[in-house]
Amino acid sequence: HYDDFCKAWLIECKRILKDNGSIWVIGSYHNIFRLGYHLQNLDYWLLNDVIWRKNNPMPNFRGTRFTNAHETLIWASKNKKSKYTFNYQSLKCLNDDLQMRSDWMLPICNGKERLKKNNGKKVHSTQKPESLLHRIILATTNKGDAIFDPFLGTGTTAVVAKKLGRKYYGIEKDKKYFKAAYDRISKTKIIEEDYLDTIENNRSKPRIPFGSLVELGIIKPGTV
């Protein structure tokens, strides 16, 4: 039944996904390989698998296995010919001007960001950190784009989308999660406008060999 369910929602996501859009799925060893299997069978085009390495993972208290210190994300376009968005330069700026790698060291959701009930218990057991969604959304969408999360949970995707000036849509059937998400999104404000503009990809600009600049007299030898 789980495989039928996964296949069904991935089909619907592909139906509404724009030709220049892309999809992200996340999971642990329990389900991510099955999701990847369905993505490929449905002719999504896999672009990257990304490892979210948690720098503060929960330990394996029984000591019977390795500590589960990462989750896997799969990024895919609608098909092989899709012209998807990838803000390469923006990611370099987040990474000390180095090309962003596919292994991301980010903390799990905790502190003030973690939603808790009055009794101190977590509202949602797998609430994702905003930093993770921030990187995904900044990397693969532009200001004004629409983002859809079919499993909204407590609203992290929508919160980050709103902060970054994106449109957001989501589905959540659990009433407790829905209320938490609604309250959280309502309190969220868009961040500084200047920050929302992605940095232009230099690869799209025409390039002139350095030697040609010297030959044309634009640059003199020894001045650079």
PLM ranges: what are they?
Residues 1-180, 221-224:
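Core catalytic lobe of class I
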Residues 183-222:
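S-adenosyl-L-methionine
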